[in-house]
Amino acid sequence: MEHVNEILATVGRILHETTTANTNVANKSTERLGAYIGAGITMVGGATVGLGQGYIFGKAVEAVARNPEVEKQVFKLIFIGSAISESSSIYSLLIAFILIFVSGA
């Protein structure tokens, strides 16, 4: 009878470890999926910055075409504004990298 109890206890431990391991794998997969989805959503910020900068540079070229004397002033302001707006794209990329590689998923 003692052997039966030992066998049942061993089988119970094995089943418990197996179900716990499968649950941990499922939880890690879900966390990883969430990190990837979050990184993708974060990079929408990078895409919108690119669209905005394209629009701004297009309008700057139109302004210079209408009034060539203001070329230096317009492009000085455009490059400063571009550098400032590019920082939000870089922050989006940084957050995406943190979500994927550092979040522990």
Swiss-Prot record:
It is found in: Cell membrane. InterPro entries: ATP_synth_F0_csu (IPR000454), ATP_synth_F0_csu_DDCD_BS (IPR020537), ATP_synth_F0_csu_sf (IPR038662), ATPase_proteolipid_c-like_dom (IPR002379), F/V-ATP_Csub_sf (IPR035921). It is a multi-pass membrane protein. GO terms for molecular function: lipid binding; proton-transporting ATP synthase activity, rotational mechanism. It comes from the Bacteria. Keywords: ATP synthesis, Cell membrane, CF(0), Hydrogen ion transport, Ion transport, Lipid-binding, Membrane, Transmembrane, Transmembrane helix, Transport. The record marks E86 as: Reversibly protonated during proton transport. GO terms for cellular component: plasma membrane; proton-transporting ATP synthase complex; proton-transporting two-sector ATPase complex, proton-transporting domain. The chain crosses the membrane at residues 37-57, 82-102. HAMAP family: ATP_synth_c_bact. Belongs to the ATPase C chain family. F(1)F(0) ATP synthase produces ATP from ADP in the presence of a proton or sodium gradient. F-type ATPases consist of two structural domains, F(1) containing the extramembraneous catalytic core and F(0) containing the membrane proton channel, linked together by a central stalk and a peripheral stalk. During catalysis, ATP synthesis in the catalytic domain of F(1) is coupled via a rotary mechanism of the central stalk subunits to proton translocation. Dicyclohexylcarbodiimide (DCDD) binding to the active glutamate residue inhibits ATPase in vitro. F-type ATPases have 2 components, F(1) - the catalytic core - and F(0) - the membrane proton channel. F(1) has five subunits: alpha(3), beta(3), gamma(1), delta(1), epsilon(1). F(0) has three main subunits: a(1), b(2) and c(10-14). The alpha and beta chains form an alternating ring which encloses part of the gamma chain. F(1) is attached to F(0) by a central stalk formed by the gamma and epsilon chains, while a peripheral stalk is formed by the delta and b chains. This is ATP synthase subunit c. It comes from Mycoplasma pneumoniae (strain ATCC 29342 / M129 / Subtype 1) (Mycoplasmoides pneumoniae). The lineage of its organism: Bacteria, Bacillati, Mycoplasmatota, Mycoplasmoidales, Mycoplasmoidaceae. The gene is atpE.
